[in-house]
Curated annotation (Swiss-Prot):
It comes from Yersinia pestis. SUPFAM superfamilies: Urease, beta-subunit (SSF51278). It is an enzyme of class 3 (hydrolase). Gene3D superfamilies: Urease, beta subunit (2.10.150.10). This is Urease subunit beta. It is found in: Cytoplasm. GO terms for biological process: urea catabolic process. Belongs to the urease beta subunit family. One of its GO terms (molecular function) is urease activity.
Length: 144
């Protein structure tokens, strides 16, 4: 058994019930994903909360920001967390592209399909311009 291993084991053994054993190095996530920052303003009269994996392009229509820049992206925050936008507040948020197949369905049904860039998989035809037009028709605010 190495000295490092026994030190770790002794830390765990000497930790009181309910105590915490922290890693020696910080935990990171989404390190290699490109980040897009957008300024968001809540034009509504109520707070709006957006979860970590909600397609940001399709968030509440009272949030005003560059929706085209948010197409295919989500908040760069840890899973199961959210950001709250108070009425009248303006804040800048970091967005990252969805991982995996980048096929998004539901939310506010503005996209319902592939949101990636480059070669189109499975004969899907992303239509970003149609989604932007549909968002405008349905009253989703955009700063551009």
């Amino acid at each position: 058994m190495s000295a490092k291993k026994s030190t770790k084991d002794s830390k765990e053994q000497n930790t009181p019930l309910g105590g915490l054993v922290l890693a020696e190095t910080p935990i990171t996530f989404n390190e290699n994903k490109p980040v897009t920052k957008v300024k968001v303003r809540n034009t509504g009269d109520r707070p709006i909360q957006v979860g970590s994996h909600f397609h940001f392009f399709e968030v509440n229509r009272a949030l005003e920001f560059d929706r085209a820049a948010a197409y295919g992206k989500r908040l760069n925050i840890s899973s199961t967390t959210a950001i709250r936008f108070e009425p009248g507040d303006e804040t800048e948020v970091p967005l990252i592209p969805f991982g995996g197949k980048q096929t998004l369905y539901g939310f506010n049904n503005l996209v319902d399909g592939w949101t990636g860039e480059g070669v189109v998989p499975n004969s899907e035809r992303p239509d970003k311009l149609a989604a932007i037009r549909l968002a405008a028709e349905r009253g989703f605010k955009s700063s551009k």
